[in-house]
């Protein structure tokens, strides 16, 4: 049976969701390089957080706001702008249209925006799977470990970059 599981993973249609890899969050080179290794292997989408106080009260409530015009730092196939923690409905619809059986998720703010993306994908009937060594956390836990623990608790599916590349 283990061989059948391994074989089914190899044949699984996958897509990559890159969350908030943008200048204001200062992604390290290792994160950009790791994501770059996945971009050539599967369809990809990215989210970018931009500020619109009329939609999301970052400044009023948190005393911080993302930039008005930040850009994506990776060459994803499609980039979707969001104004809060969750990915947009259009992004989720696009992933559905790709008919991905599993959505690999990586990026910045593992304990907030990445986790929120996991909830949105899960609720949409997709299979969110975190690439656990391709995340950074928020200012609360820059290591990303808190986000990985929360993801494991809520969704169970965490893989490493090496595991994805080995498939």
Residues covered by each model-derived region:
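Short beta-strand segments at enzyme active-site cores
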Residues: 45-49
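Transmembrane alpha-helix/helix-exit interface in multi-pass inner-membrane proteins
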Residues: 51-53
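Active-site-adjacent betaalpha module
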Residues: 2-15, 24, 41-43, 57-167
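Short hydrophobic beta-strand that contains or immediately precedes a catalytic carboxylate
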Residues: 17-19
């Amino acid at each position: 049976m283990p061989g059948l599981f391994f074989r089914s993973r190899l044949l699984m249609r996958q897509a990559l969701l890159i969350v908030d890899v943008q200048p204001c969050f200062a992604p390290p080179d290792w994160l950009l390089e790791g994501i770059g290794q996945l971009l050539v292997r599967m369809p990809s989408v990215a989210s970018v957080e931009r500020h619109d106080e009329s939609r999301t009260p970052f400044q009023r409530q948190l005393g911080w706001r993302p930039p008005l015009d930040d850009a994506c730092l990776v060459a994803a196939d499609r980039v979707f702008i969001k104004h809060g923690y969750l990915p947009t409905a259009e992004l989720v619809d696009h992933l559905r249209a790709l008919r991905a059986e599993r959505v690999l998720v990586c990026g910045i703010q593992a304990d907030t925006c990445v986790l929120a993306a996991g909830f949105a994908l899960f609720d949409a009937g997709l299979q969110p799977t975190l690439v656990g060594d391709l995340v950074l956390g928020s200012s609360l836990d820059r290591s990303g470990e808190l986000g990985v623990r929360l993801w494991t608790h809520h969704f169970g599916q965490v893989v490493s970059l090496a595991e994805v590349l080995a498939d």
